[in-house]
């Protein structure tokens, strides 16, 4: 039997995931602040602003701009808001979400200023117990999901029964969720791979080839694994769909905003210029400094994140970034 599911945020990924939920037989309500998006989904089953490639969204998808109306009957509430705005946005929903509802995060990022993961931000904002929070992460490029190409993901919750409920609610013929209790690992994978994607994109944009990309990706994986384990994650998580899988998809596709943003930097655009031509938020940009700060907090070296922070804050070139990443000491891998 289908559930009542609300998706907070009608961006490309939120809308694509809403379609997955609708295809799985649920009644889906999208919440958005933009009246144009609300009316488009509600009246025409089309999100012309954020996901124009899908000509007709399922009939069992609707939309509202009213917070209370959006969540009042929800069994599951999915959060698909830009990570750095999550806390401010979610506070407005505190006390509105039903006590039985599971809250699921699609967000990927580390909050600037607090160095907190999205699971921490969501739970604090909504005063939510850990067993009612779940996160979803994996190699899930929104356009491919929207086109219903076969894909898999991982659902994490400290309560495995609740993880399974969420997974069942988003299982379709083309979308396969797996479950885990490693919330920390899943969150760290989703956040930190965006920084790696920025660096790979920058190298590609600057004209470097496969060797350079592979070097950045593998060192990025080592960096995010070390940081994740220090935060309490299971190292195995980093070698599954949420880790290596997401890294491969994000670092190798022009559909990835982080990769594309980095590529524009590599071609010589400034951060401001790359931001203007970006279609949506490249979460790796605000996350980079937060990753460096988190590494300092956990006493874990983050050379890739540090060099990318220099790119973003000081405007160093790709060659300077790579030179800084290499260093001069001979070390063990």
UniProtKB/Swiss-Prot annotation:
GO CC terms in record: cytosol
EC number: 1.1.1.94
Binding site for sn-glycerol 3-phosphate: 108, 138, 193, 246, 256-258
Active-site residue numbers: 193
InterPro entries linked: 6-PGluconate_DH-like_C_sf (IPR008927), 6PGD_dom2 (IPR013328), G3P_DH_NAD-dep (IPR006168), G3P_DH_NAD-dep_C (IPR006109), G3P_DH_NAD-dep_N (IPR011128), NAD(P)-bd_dom_sf (IPR036291)
Enzyme class: oxidoreductase
Matches recorded under SUPFAM superfamilies: 6-phosphogluconate dehydrogenase C-terminal domain-like, NAD(P)-binding Rossmann-fold domains
Localization terms from the record: Cytoplasm
Catalytic activity: sn-glycerol 3-phosphate + NAD(+) = dihydroxyacetone phosphate + NADH + H(+); sn-glycerol 3-phosphate + NADP(+) = dihydroxyacetone phosphate + NADPH + H(+)
Annotated PROSITE patterns: NAD_G3PDH
Molecular-function GO term, any one: NAD binding
GO biological-process terms attached to the record: carbohydrate metabolic process; glycerol-3-phosphate biosynthetic process; glycerol-3-phosphate catabolic process; glycerophospholipid metabolic process; phospholipid biosynthetic process
Homology family: Belongs to the NAD-dependent glycerol-3-phosphate dehydrogenase family.
PANTHER family xref list: GLYCEROL-3-PHOSPHATE DEHYDROGENASE, GLYCEROL-3-PHOSPHATE DEHYDROGENASE [NAD(+)] 2, CHLOROPLASTIC
Identification of the protein by name: Glycerol-3-phosphate dehydrogenase [NAD(P)+]
């Amino acid at each position: 039997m289908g559930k009542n599911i609300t998706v907070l945020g009608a961006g490309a990924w939120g809308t694509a995931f809403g379609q997955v939920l609708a295809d799985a037989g649920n009644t889906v309500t999208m919440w958005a602040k933009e009246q144009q998006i609300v009316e488009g989904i509600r009246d025409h089953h089309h999100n012309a602003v954020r996901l124009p490639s899908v000509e007709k969204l399922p009939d069992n998808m609707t939309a509202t701009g009213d917070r209370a109306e959006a969540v009042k009957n929800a069994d599951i509430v999915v959060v698909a808001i830009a990570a750095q705005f999550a806390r401010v946005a979610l506070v407005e929903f505190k006390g509105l979400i039903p006590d039985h509802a599971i809250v699921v995060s699609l967000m990927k990022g580390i909050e600037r200023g607090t160095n907190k993961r999205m699971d921490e931000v969501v739970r604090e904002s909504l005063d939510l117990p850990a067993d009612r929070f779940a996160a979803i992460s994996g190699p899930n490029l929104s356009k491919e999901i929207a086109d219903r190409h076969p894909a898999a993901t991982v659902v994490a919750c400290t309560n495995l029964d609740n993880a399974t409920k969420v997974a069942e609610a988003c299982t379709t013929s083309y979308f396969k969720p797996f479950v885990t209790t490693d919330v920390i690992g899943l969150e760290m994978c989703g956040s930190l791979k965006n920084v790696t994607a920025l660096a790979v994109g920058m190298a590609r944009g600057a004209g470097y080839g496969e060797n350079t990309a592979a070097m950045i990706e593998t060192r990025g994986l080592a960096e995010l694994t070390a940081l994740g384990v220090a935060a309490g994650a299971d190292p195995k998580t980093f070698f599954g769909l949420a880790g290596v899988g997401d890294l491969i998809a994000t670092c190798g596709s022009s559909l990835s905003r982080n990769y594309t943003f980095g590529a524009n930097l590599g071609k010589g655009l400034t951060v401001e210029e790359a931001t203007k031509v970006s279609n949506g938020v490249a979460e790796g940009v605000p996350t980079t400094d937060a990753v460096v700060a988190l590494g300092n907090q956990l006493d874990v070296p983050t050379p890739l994140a540090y060099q990318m922070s220099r790119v973003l804050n000081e405007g160093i070139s790709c060659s300077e970034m790579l030179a800084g990443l290499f260093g001069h000491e001979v070390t063990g891998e």
